[in-house]
Amino acid sequence: MVDVPVALAGRQYVIHVGPGLLDQLGERVAALRPTSIVVVTDPTVAALYLERAVRSLQPVARTEHFVLPASEAAKDLAAAAKVVDALVAARADRRSLLVALGGGVVGDIAGFAAAIFMRGIRFVQVPTTLLAQVDSSVGGKTGVNHAAGKNLIGAFHQPGMVLADTSLLHSLPAREVSAGLAEVVKHGLLADADYFAQVEGLMPRLLECDDAALGPVVARSCAIKAGVVGRDERESGERALLNLGHTFGHAIEAMSGYGRWLHGEAVGCGLCLAADLSRRMDLIDSGDLQRIEHAVASARLPVRIPGFERGRAIEQMRGDKKSEGGRMRFIVLERIGRAAQRLVPDAVLDATLVAGGYV
């Protein structure tokens, strides 16, 4: 097991990474001394892991659960309200603990409900997908979607702990594994060229959920994100770099209808578009672009998702929260292993969209 600290101003929590951790959940949350526990999960995860989680937690405090019909299309205020209703029904108080057992959607909804219930109660993330383990469970971003865009309603609410049991990833469909690898590739691209090269070499083993390959990769991705979050918790500067590929990716998700493409699939395509943008701005060369596209393709992710109207895509991206005053600000690559924020000329963006198959 590897412990990755997340050091914030005046406080710290730990990401525990390793196989077999789910059965230690109760032992690890006991130090939080909750008056009661509510586990929020989805139907798929409930069938696989809920009984084990509850069995581990029951000796610690009265434990109840709520099964949320979680999907990206249903990640909205109504879903968060259902979790709040479940907390009320469970007679939760300000010393209660909410446990988010599931993928990124469950974590986002449950974390947001924890942030708003009684002005904030503690919660613990137990991510069950690769994407959630390496990215969405770390850093305290919680929220839900709005018709106008992804994650427009939310709050920063840090978990008390993250427990990333890598053995849970063996139950993932291949498509979900690939989706998580998009964030792994992203971390190497924006922060660590050596890690990016390591991921390139490990890709076949990662796709097979090889334990010896997965553990170090999950821990390294968590450490990269934890370092950025520790330096910029509220995204006033450096943390925005973690959005590499996401302005494009969020637009793809919104235009195609939430759920048509997994978040990681849209981000994988977004990474390629961001790399193309970087090449057109003479920040990276064509060899770097080809290498990035090959890494995304080798993760079995789409390099291009064509067919969208350019005007609609641009309008969608202008509404993204990484746009300021209507100006288009993107995270670009200065080289593999280093990202930066840049204002992008409209002509360059248009050329990238044309190259990506937009009409």
Roles of regions detected by a PLM:
Residues M1-L97:
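ATP/NTP phosphate-donor binding region
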Residues I109-G120, M255-S256, D276:
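Alpha-helix C-terminal capping segments
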Residues F112-R205:
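A glycine/threonine-rich phosphate-anchoring loop and its flanking beta-alpha core
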Residues V105-F112, Q133-V134, H250-A251:
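Short glycine/serine/threonine-rich phosphate/pyrophosphate-binding segments
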Residues V2, A182-V184, L283-V359:
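C-terminal charged capping/lid subdomain of soluble metabolic enzymes
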Residues A70-S71, L101-G103, L244-G245:
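Glycine-rich beta-strand-to-loop/alpha-helix junction loops that act as flexible
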Residues A197-G311:
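Active-site segments that bind and position negatively charged phosphate/pyrophosphate groups
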